[in-house]
């Protein structure tokens, strides 16, 4: 009978520690998000993440269309 209680307590402790670990690992990202929200920082725009030579997406798209138009169909 004591073994069943010991097993139940062990499983409860295991579940509680798992939830605590998940909660405490979430805290740093929450704190960072709150700090950036308070300071008013905005996320960078998508275009700022690309190198300057890659900014002209439409021109590259037209170049690919021209390239594929000249390729033979198999």
From Swiss-Prot:
Residues 1-22 form the signal peptide. Its main location: secreted. The keyword Secreted applies. It is found in: Secreted; Target cell membrane. GO terms for biological process: defense response to bacterium. GO terms for cellular component: extracellular region; membrane; other organism cell membrane. Keywords: Amidation, Antibiotic, Antimicrobial, Cleavage on pair of basic residues, Membrane, Secreted, Signal, Target cell membrane, Target membrane. Belongs to the non-disulfide-bridged peptide (NDBP) superfamily. Short antimicrobial peptide (group 4) family. Has potent antibacterial activity against Gram-positive bacteria M.luteus, B.thuringiensis, S.aureus and B.subtilis, but not Gram-negative bacteria. Shows a weak cytotoxicity effect against mammalian cell lines and relatively low hemolytic activity against human erythrocytes. This is Imcroporin. It comes from Isometrus maculatus.
